[in-house]
């Protein structure tokens, strides 16, 4: 799994240096988000169109032939609309259990989605529906890396 903030760099650099090499990999699960300064501070935030990135990936021959998947992260209605428009997977990084159940309901109505329903977890909530659990091993913010690992593996 690789999650990318589409606004962290210039669009051409994003395609050439990040996305194109990732699309060479087989069975890569790519996540896209637009980022904000809520969890990680950025010196510069670009205003890239996430739909341009989605279309670039979905039309890429390697994405198709390598059996890769694509999901969107975020809780906004605009992100959920993109999931439905492009038939993508959904990930929840932060947010409430009720937000995740709402995402499950949206995902459940997709026909042959191009990604999975997933949640980055630090707790042991059990749901009766199937979803991919993503354990965060490294956060891009190195300052909180150790704290994140401690929170993932602590016994509540």
Task: Indicate residue ranges for each PLM-predicted region.
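Active-site-adjacent structural elements that line small-molecule/cofactor binding pockets in enzymes
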Residues: 1-156
